[in-house]
Amino acid sequence: MPIRILPSDLSSQISAGEIIERPASVVKEIIENSIDAGSKNINIIVENSGFQSIILKDDGCGIDKKDLLLAVCHHATSKINSLSDLDKLTTFGFRGEALASIRAVSRLTLISCTRFNDVAAKIYLEGFCSKNIILQPIAHPEGTTIIVDNLFYNIPVRLKFLKNKKLEFSKICEVVKKIALSHFYINFSLKHNNKLITQYNSINNRKNKINRLKDIFDTLDTSEFLEIKEKKYRMVLFGWISHPYNFKKIKNIQYCYVNNRYLYNNIFVNAVRAAYSKIEQKKNISFVLYLTIESFNIDINIHPTKNEIKFHNPDVVYTFIYEAVFSYLKKIKEKYYFNFSCKKQTQLNKEKEFYFYDSDPTFLTLISSIFLKKKQICKNIKNKIKHNNFISKSTPLEKYESSIGRLLIIIHKYYGLIYHDNNFLLLSFPVAKGIVRKQKLKNNIQKENIIEYFLSNIKINLTSQEYLILFNKKEILSKFGFHLIFKKKYVILSSIPAFLKKCNFHIIISNFFAFLFLKKQVFISDIVDWFYINVFIELKNWTYIRGIEVLLEIEYYCPLLLINPPSKLLQKININAALCILKI
């Protein structure tokens, strides 16, 4: 549809377009225009947080040269002809004010070419004071380039309120992130001051859409999210929700989209929270959800930024979202019920189903509360340093040398370079920490000093053989903090060792019990070794301070280990061999 100026009676009924408040407003408007043009590649280049320059290049259908001058006028659009067209709108823009608003506060250059044009056309405008605007021919591939220079050059008062350039650039990044989250098939790139900041590659396979979340939230553990898809009431809900029984701290992420348009809607958020409250009381609920609904069932013409919409049937939408999320949470709940059946040895490493029962069978609850048994509190490393005087107060931390040696630097996140007696050694921190925790567990068992975490009673369905195995091992399990109550046909688990509280312990316990079912006879050392392999060795980014702490702990808990350290813990670096190679 060609660009045309809307008649005054129609333009007066459309809500006012967004005022350009900051550089992020410009980026949002021009990206949405590119998406409406069918672009597959959108590149944004920003200088000085957008105040000096914002450049967007796309490979969309372009603007015909005869429409280029109209494109920068108020109420000029190709999206609608009448008010009724809003009911079947599928594009972002429709008011025809984006480029006009940007033009009013900047020096704007617009270059575009369609597949029907032999040559591209270019126009340059400075605010609304530009006169005798001339179309200039220029070489340009199919698509559009928009250059916004000197934003707010003619409104210096606005610049006084936008002094924090880091904040303004972060808002630009957030705009790109929100749009990229709902347009998987588009390549997005963002450069700032000639430096590539983000690059989101297109994803055309639905199964790989979760990769866009990984790209955008680089520290996010996507394994803690569940994919959902539900279709009902002529609506489709798709996306990801955080695992209801995940005990790791994850970033609080809440993104709602309706017909691929980002918005924050109370109906959305309240429906999701209500669904979670029926399963598990969680303060931090994360989700990225996409609702597809027929255009005539929503009104997008109620807010200048289009970040709010009106549902014509809000109760139906709320019910649909609530039922969709709750049904998936309920399935996950049932999946993690305890159901131990160990008939084959090959099932040892398979996840077992967990069955959790409340006193009311109609409302099953997974661990509704976990609290620490106020029995004993282990001393942390700071107390060890304080009371055992491992380090003199006058000794600088970077010069502290343990019996292993002096820690120089951290290498590849997990290893420490240590200098000792003119030798360089490489220490594995994950292995070292695992050994320390293993030794501490042995010490606590010997002293009957295991700290327990109490759970709301968890009912475990067992076969007669499994029941007998656990019954014969109940004493050794109690030493580790597993308190089991044996009923006629099932077992109730009421506590676990405290060191499991930060793990996904429902999976750990499943695998641990499966390990027990395959062992005719189990000793304390066997269980300690199992936890060492499956729980204690953790790959985390190590810092210099944490490295010093683990050296102190090895000295304190495992002094004999230093006489003949295992090869997986400590490796000597052959400096002499390297020097021989380097000699001229």
Curated annotation (Swiss-Prot):
Gene Ontology MF: a single term: ATP-dependent DNA damage sensor activity
Q: Which NCBIfam families match?
A: mutl
Output the CDD domains linked to this UniProt entry. HATPase_MutL-MLH-PMS-like, MutL_Trans_MutL
Q: What does this protein do?
A: This protein is involved in the repair of mismatches in DNA. It is required for dam-dependent methyl-directed DNA mismatch repair. May act as a 'molecular matchmaker', a protein that promotes the formation of a stable complex between two or more DNA-binding proteins in an ATP-dependent manner without itself being part of a final effector complex.
The yes or no answer to whether the keyword DNA damage is present is yes
What protein family is recorded? Belongs to the DNA mismatch repair MutL/HexB family.
Keywords of the record: DNA damage, DNA repair
| InterPro entries hit by this protein | DNA_mismatch_repair_CS, DNA_mismatch_repair_MutL, DNA_mismatch_S5_2-like, HATPase_C_sf, MutL/Mlh/PMS, MutL/Mlh/Pms-like, MutL_C, MutL_C_dimsub
Q: Give the transmembrane region(s).
A: none
GO CC terms of this entry: mismatch repair complex
Query: What is the designated name of this protein?
Result: DNA mismatch repair protein MutL
Establish whether keyword DNA repair is in the entry.
Answer: yes
Any one GO biological process: mismatch repair
